[in-house]
Amino acid sequence: SPGPGRPEQAGISVPALQRFAGTLPILGVCLGHQALATAFGGRVDRARAPMHGKVSTITHDGRGVFAGLPASIDVGRYHSLVIPPDAVPSGFIVAATVQGGDDEGTVMGIRHQQWPVFGVQFHPESVLTPDGHRLLRTFLETR
């Protein structure tokens, strides 16, 4: 699989997320998003096709890190693993999904229902994510 591997192989990421979720704001990006699912009992599967350097349009619920963003945004994707919609961990909700295309409905964002803990499958820091800086600013202002 292209990319850095599976969440279980990401050093101390999973135990660190389990330890600090609920005490610190957390934003998991790509592998970090997948690690959140793994840390809290969700599942990560291989995507239908690798998405490396691809742009997709997503829709979101306008809450958490998506607050203040247009209802649909373009995002840069660099991954070959995904959290299936039926495998989002307990305590989290799907906050964003792909709109249109062959992988419509693919989970692109999750949010914990009580804690300031967020995951995004895409890369907000990528030039392919024009509104990514706004998402990151919103996260940095999270308390």
Predicted regions and their residues:
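Generic recognition of short, well-ordered alpha-helical segments
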Residues: 11-15, 87-89, 130-134
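Conserved hydrophobic/aromatic beta-strand scaffold that supports enzyme active sites
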Residues: 55-57, 107-109, 119
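Acyltransferase
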Residues: 127-143
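Phosphate-binding/catalytic loops
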Residues: 114, 119-130
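Cysteine-nucleophile active-site neighborhood
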Residues: 1-68, 72, 136
